[in-house]
Each structure stands twice: as structure tokens, then as C-alpha cells.
Amino acid sequence: MNGLGLLLLIGFSGVAACQSSYKPTAAESKDSFHCIRVPAEQLDFFRKQPPVQFWQKVILLTKDSAIVVHKDSRNMMDVISAKRLDSLVNCSGLEKTAQCYRDSFGYETCELVKFVRGKREFFDFKKVGPLVDDAKQVFDEIGVNPIYAQWILLIESPNNPRARSVSGAVGHYQLMPFVAKKYGLVVSSGRDDRHDFQLSSMAAAKLMRDYCIPNASRMALSLGLQPDVDQLWFQLLVMHVYNAGAGNVRKAVAAVGEVQSGEELLLKLWKTQAGAFGNSSQNYSQLALASYINYLDWLKSE
């Protein structure tokens, strides 16, 4: 599964945001939006992690600014204007500037410094709420926790109705053609059911039920962890399978090795590269958490 353009201007791989055929009416307001909640005691552990806090900042920052961040620790060293970043790129001064930040913060020359543009405009939460309401009905009917639909809809922004991934994934759930066809959707030159929200919700829910959750369960058991569909760490592992595919996540889990808890597994996955499980795959669950936390804050705001 190849979803979510992961937004780093420099060195960040990713794919385009999902399509959206939904247009909210003027009468709709966030007061009526449904939100599938994560238990606070489970969320608190991940809320404190620097990678999640970093993505929260990226989501809140407008595109006229950029964060200077140490890649491994997610230490946010500075916020600069997009104009300055553009000038650094144009005059090939980016690496020299990165080295200045390394020197100032005591990092080694080999450590990566990234420049990440703000993406507030990309995450349009007011378009997500009605979609979550509709998706919840479909996921409930199929017996899959609709929290997965909410995360996907939050991070596969509905803000670009005509975009598709370079790998051919299309729609609100960034479904690949073979996945869509497996669950009865038509994908042809004249018709693409991945544009149909109800049909694509059905396909995504069945994919979770038949493929993502069972594979995540087997991976957890391979590490001596008990799969629990109600635990946040397990749900995030499922999200990684949805995004990167079971084979790639399995390689990453094997590279992680022994862990004492599901939470430890997730933190190590965020720093593990194996096979095609790379930078964008690491970031997927971080961004899911960050967008969810920001969505909660947005729902509470005036």
C-alpha cells in the first residue's frame, strides 16, 4: 500500500495525497463531526515522543515557513522562512547551512539535518469529519475498527481531488489497482471505482480485515507480543502494514529484534530501515498520531 506524500522538501520520498469527491455543505460544522477516540492512557505515551511532536508542528505551520530539524532525534532547531529556504536551494547553500546548525547544536557532520516546509494548508480538517462519519458506518458493518479509516482520511488529505501516487494508488484510501479489483471495484480507462467513497471504504475495510490485521498479529506473535486489537501500539502496527505492505514491515520487525513491549516495537520501527521500509514508512504512524492529536485540538477549538 503506497499512501501519503510525506512532505519533506529535502530528501523526503512520498506520494501524492488522495483524491476526494466529497464537498461539505455550508450547513455542516465540526460540532456535528464524529471522532473515534483513542484511550487517553494509551495516547499519552506516544504524545510525548519527539517525532510525534515534530509532525504536530509541521501540520500547524503554514507553507511560508520551514522547520530545521535533526533527523534522528527530531530536535527542532529553528524555524526559517520559505523564501530563505528557496534561496538556499537556489544557491546550493543548503548543506553549508545544515553544517552551521550541526556545529551550533553539537551534532556530528555525518548526522542529517532536514528542512521541512509547513503543511497546514494540506491538512484540511473540516473536510475530514463528514468523511469519517460515512466511513464509520462501512467499517462497522464489516467489523473493523473505524479508527483505521479516521487515520487514513486524516493523513491522506482530501484537499487535492485529482492527485494520485506515482505507484498508481488512487482515492481516499490510496488503493492500488490490484487491491481494488480484488474486492470487486472496477478499475479501467473508462471507470475507476476508487473514486467512489462508499466502495473504496468497503475495500479498505476488507483489506484491513483480511490482510493487515492478520499479518500484524503474526508479526507481534513472532516477537512474543500478544496482539490486542484495542491497543494503540497494535493499531499503529496495522497501519504500517497498510502503508508499506506486510513483506516490508516483516523485514523491519525482524531487524528490530527482541522487544519488551508493543510501544518499544513502534519506537524502534521509527528508526529502522529494511527492504523498502524506509523514511516514509517510518513516518507513517508518527503522522497518523500527530494528525489525530491536532484533529482533537481542532475539534475543541472555537
Each predicted region: which residue ranges?
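Substrate-binding/active-site groove segments that recognize
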Residues: 167-189, 199-212, 263-264
